[in-house]
Amino acid sequence: MKLAVYGKGGIGKSTTSCNISIALARRGKKVLQIGCDPKHDSTFTLTGFLIPTIIDTLQAKDYHYENVWPEDVIYQGYGGVDCVEAGGPPAGAGCGGYVVGETVKLLKELNAFYEYDIILFDVLGDVVCGGFAAPLNYADYCLIVTDNGFDALFAANRIAASVREKARTHPLRLAGLVANRTTKRDLIDKYVQVCPIPVLEVLPLLEDIRVSRVKGKTLFEMAESEPDLSFVLDYYLNIADQLLTEPEGVVPRELGDRELFSLLSDFYLNIENQTSVNKTEKLDFFLV
């Protein structure tokens, strides 16, 4: 099974991806996580350091694939999850899709691409150009990390459009949304009512999820020394269990930009109006 994880920049895709990878490994699967971001920090919480990228390694070998060995590019991280960082082209030049293609090509040359039960692509931000949509060419399922906010859902809608487009020519489905670090899901529910997409999980608004990134550890590793965090692991294990059932998924029908803007902005305005009414009612009560 091949998964591609997308979402708005800064929403917590890499943190979510790493914990899902470990959850899948805990279920007995052999997992490879491929970071598809020029920052090459997708697997940082798994390995504890920034591993060399595929592109850096190929450049050092003058692009002689026959001189590259698996141990040059594949690093084992926490929980037995293997890690690869694709890297990216120089700033302002090249195409990220080409880099992803070269990564897959090299892994196939090394006979590594088909050795894993699960390959998870953790993809740069909410970029949905043809280049960074390239991992969708290889994926069975796409997951979108979001929160209960306007910007994240707007990005999710654009990514859903990319999934629909790729699904025309590839056996790709959208597995669902993962809401990261939120106490509410009312705006998410409003969106999925109009654009039916499964919600796989709603992760709690827990500061330790954000701090884990700074510590360079996954929540699974942190929980070994902080037992109070053990309850959070069940959220990721639940996502893993749903994915392992090979869900039907959906080919989404995204909303038009103006339609989505109207839907989400009306939701906020209605909340503000309702809040104003409630304040007035309370004030009248006290005046009486």
From Swiss-Prot:
Q: What catalytic activity does the UniProt entry give for this protein?
A: chlorophyllide a + oxidized 2[4Fe-4S]-[ferredoxin] + 2 ADP + 2 phosphate = protochlorophyllide a + reduced 2[4Fe-4S]-[ferredoxin] + 2 ATP + 2 H2O
Principal place where this protein is found? Answer: plastid
Tell me the residue numbers annotated for binding ATP.
10-15, 39, 180-181, 204-206
Which pathway, metabolic or otherwise, does it act in?
Porphyrin-containing compound metabolism; chlorophyll biosynthesis (light-independent)
Q: Which UniProt keywords apply?
A: 4Fe-4S, ATP-binding, Chlorophyll biosynthesis, Chloroplast, Iron, Iron-sulfur, Magnesium, Metal-binding, Nucleotide-binding, Oxidoreductase, Photosynthesis, Plastid
What is the top-level taxon of the source organism?
Eukaryota
Name its cellular compartments.
Answer: Plastid, Chloroplast
Give EC number(s), comma-separated. Answer: 1.3.7.7
Described purpose of this protein according to its UniProt entry: Component of the dark-operative protochlorophyllide reductase (DPOR) that uses Mg-ATP and reduced ferredoxin to reduce ring D of protochlorophyllide (Pchlide) to form chlorophyllide a (Chlide). This reaction is light-independent. The L component serves as a unique electron donor to the NB-component of the complex, and binds Mg-ATP.
Q: How does it assemble?
A: Homodimer. Protochlorophyllide reductase is composed of three subunits; ChlL, ChlN and ChlB.
Primary enzyme class: oxidoreductase
PANTHER family cross-referenced by the UniProt entry: LIGHT-INDEPENDENT PROTOCHLOROPHYLLIDE REDUCTASE IRON-SULFUR ATP-BINDING PROTEIN
* GO terms for MF: 4 iron, 4 sulfur cluster binding; ATP binding; metal ion binding; oxidoreductase activity, acting on iron-sulfur proteins as donors; oxidoreductase activity, acting on the CH-CH group of donors, iron-sulfur protein as acceptor
Q: Which Gene Ontology cellular-component terms appear in the entry?
A: chloroplast
The record lists [4Fe-4S] cluster as bound by 95, 129
Gene3D superfamilies the record matches: P-loop containing nucleotide triphosphate hydrolases
Query: What name appears for this protein in its UniProt entry?
Result: Light-independent protochlorophyllide reductase iron-sulfur ATP-binding protein
Task: State the CDD domains in the record.
Answer: Bchl-like
Instruction: Write down the InterPro entries for this protein, in alphabetical order.
Output: NifH/chlL_CS, NifH/frxC, P-loop_NTPase, Protochlorophyllide_ATP-bd
Record-listed Mg(2+) binding positions:
14
What are the top taxonomic ranks of the organism?
Eukaryota, Viridiplantae, Chlorophyta, core chlorophytes, Chlorophyceae
**Family per similarity comment:** Belongs to the NifH/BchL/ChlL family.
Q: Name one GO biological process term.
A: light-independent chlorophyll biosynthetic process
